[in-house]
Amino acid sequence: MAKLTKRARMIAEKVEARDYDVNEAITLLKELATAKFTESVDVAVNLGIDARKSDQNVRGATVLPNGTGRDVRVAVFTSGDNAEKAKAAGADIVGMEDLAAQVKKGEMNFDVVVASPDAMRVVGQLGQILGPRGLMPNPKTGTVTPDVATAVKNAKAGQVRYRNDKNGIVHATIGRVDFDNDKLKENLEALLAALKKAKPSSAKGVFVKRISLSTTMGAGVSIDQATVAAV
């Protein structure tokens, strides 16, 4: 408990209730990241949408220019030539009914699921298993596609999927504390650019209302939007 108290005290002393220049914020977060593992750097973006309205929900995916720092395992539901293309692109597991049987047994050693359109007849039976885990393939995130090879490459390259929660906030990981500041900023700006492009036509007023950065075990730091190029 003493360690938690010490960490909380350090955060309270160093984090001010103001908007930080993005570079200053990243430097501060790194200073506060004292966990015994390499912490992720996460962003929360408050959007000016009414999340209760389906036509204002924001969902999609984008490849971060510097990746996320994670090794991503990709499972692909497909067959024939597409199966060979998926393997060549780096897929970790490829199959159809055999892969579905593994999932039903609870054997899910993967982080992303991709499916070709013809495989959705098989994947559709797994909705209650994959859905709650955020693994269900979806055309909006590019994970239901005839071009499974590109989807695999994107996932391996550091693609992040985003979706607003019930409060209209998008949460995503943009890297780790051992990334250079410039790389984290580039990743943040790439995500913000993707969100801006995904703005629903029915959303009125200010779209990006607030941006805050945090690490896995750290406090949130509010970002001055004028210091981020994509906003």
From Swiss-Prot:
- Cellular component terms, GO, for this chain's entry? cytosolic large ribosomal subunit
Q: Name one Pfam family in it.
A: Ribosomal_L1
Which keywords does this chain's UniProt record carry? Repressor, Ribonucleoprotein, Ribosomal protein, RNA-binding, rRNA-binding, Translation regulation, tRNA-binding
PROSITE patterns noted in UniProt: RIBOSOMAL_L1
**Which GO terms fall under biological process for this protein?**
regulation of translation; translation
**Domain of life according to the entry:** Bacteria
For this protein, the record's InterPro entries field holds: Ribosom_uL1_bac-type (IPR005878), Ribosomal_uL1 (IPR002143), Ribosomal_uL1-like (IPR023674), Ribosomal_uL1/biogenesis (IPR028364), Ribosomal_uL1_3-a/b-sand (IPR016095), Ribosomal_uL1_CS (IPR023673)
Tell me one GO molecular function of this protein.
structural constituent of ribosome
Q: Which family does it belong to?
A: Belongs to the universal ribosomal protein uL1 family.
Chain's role: Binds directly to 23S rRNA. The L1 stalk is quite mobile in the ribosome, and is involved in E site tRNA release.
Q: How does it assemble?
A: Part of the 50S ribosomal subunit.
Q: Which PANTHER family match?
A: 54S RIBOSOMAL PROTEIN L1, MITOCHONDRIAL, LARGE RIBOSOMAL SUBUNIT PROTEIN UL1M
Could you tell me what this protein is called? Large ribosomal subunit protein uL1
Tell me which species this is from.
Idiomarina loihiensis (strain ATCC BAA-735 / DSM 15497 / L2-TR)
Name of encoding gene: rplA
